[in-house]
């Protein structure tokens, strides 16, 4: 959000997959940086969690595959939630059929951050990036830690400051002993996770 999205106070941040561990972190960080946060999730239960974590508005989307009409309808939902100027930053954790409607709701010169794609690798019509004059940016934290260790250390220090200030807090929804680690993976695969799923070593 900071390095690739250049987030600032007053931005509109649209988060796809906002109720998982990464999504909840994005909600909290967005609010800490002064953004208006729109959380896109797949159920009422996840919508309630997103609101509890600080989301200003929530969009509940269906399950893909989407036909053209469904894709257009989702884009309209995103636009309505983001407001007339669109989302300054789209934080896409899910990919697949969800990505194109989000690009359609992006602001002029917005940033589309590709964070993950459990719903499949998105096929974006590149003409949309021209029409919106927007940037599509990959976000690969694992490689970043190796290539930019000093910057990463500074970010970690900032996260601890935000934690101390009570602006962010890990939300653990399930714990499994290592012997039942498969259940944790299944929970993630079935998109049942809300917040972090932890595997304990004891």
Cite the ranges covered by each PLM segment.
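Glycine-rich helix-loop-beta junction characteristic of Rossmann-like nucleotide cofactor-binding loops
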Residues: 3-7, 81-84, 104
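NAD(P)H cofactor-binding loop motif with strongest signal on the N-terminal glycine-rich segment
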Residues: 17-18, 94, 117
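Adenosine-nucleotide cofactor-binding segment
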Residues: 31-97, 151
């Amino acid at each position: 959000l900071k390095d690739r999205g250049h987030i600032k106070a007053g931005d509109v941040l649209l988060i796809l997959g906002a109720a998982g561990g990464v999504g909840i972190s994005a909600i909290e960080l967005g609010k800490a940086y002064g953004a208006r946060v729109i959380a896109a999730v797949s159920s009422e239960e996840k919508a309630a969690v997103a609101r509890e974590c600080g989301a200003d508005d929530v969009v509940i989307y269906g399950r893909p595959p989407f036909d053209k009409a469904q894709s257009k309808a989702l884009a309209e939902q995103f636009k309505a939630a983001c407001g007339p100027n669109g989302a300054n930053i789209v934080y896409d954790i899910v990919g697949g059929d969800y990505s194109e409607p989000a690009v359609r709701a992006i602001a002029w010169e917005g940033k589309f951050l590709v964070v993950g794609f459990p719903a499949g690798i998105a096929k974006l019509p590149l003409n949309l990036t021209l029409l919106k004059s927007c940037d599509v940016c990959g976000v690969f934290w694992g490689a970043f830690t190796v290539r930019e260790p000093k910057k990463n250390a500074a970010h970690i220090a900032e996260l601890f400051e935000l934690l101390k200030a009570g602006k962010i807090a890990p939300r653990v929804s399930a714990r499994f002993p290592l012997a039942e680690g498969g259940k944790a993976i299944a929970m993630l695969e079935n998109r049942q996770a809300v917040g972090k799923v932890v595997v304990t070593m004891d």
